Amino acid sequence: MKASELKDKTVEQLQEELLGLRREQFNLRMQAATGQLNQTHMMKQVRRDIARVKTILNEKAGA
């Protein structure tokens, strides 16, 4: 997910995206804890996507 794609979305869409990413992060953590996670790079990718969404939300709140 690119920041330029996120800037085109509304605040409501960004909040929905953030909620979905947090759920995905939770599921990945549970899979890692039980030893079922094969693609460990996904945890890092989701964490950074969450940071991107939160950054854009803060930018929109300040504007």
From Swiss-Prot:
The keyword Ribonucleoprotein applies. CDD domains: Ribosomal_L29_HIP. InterPro entries: Ribosomal_protein_uL29 (IPR050063), Ribosomal_uL29 (IPR001854), Ribosomal_uL29_CS (IPR018254), Ribosomal_uL29_sf (IPR036049). It comes from the Bacteria. The keyword Hydrolase does not apply. One of its GO terms (biological process) is translation. GO terms for cellular component: cytosolic large ribosomal subunit. Keywords: Ribonucleoprotein, Ribosomal protein. Pfam families: Ribosomal_L29 (PF00831). GO terms for molecular function: structural constituent of ribosome. Belongs to the universal ribosomal protein uL29 family. This is Large ribosomal subunit protein uL29. It comes from Idiomarina loihiensis (strain ATCC BAA-735 / DSM 15497 / L2-TR). The lineage of its organism: Bacteria, Pseudomonadati, Pseudomonadota, Gammaproteobacteria, Alteromonadales. The gene is rpmC.
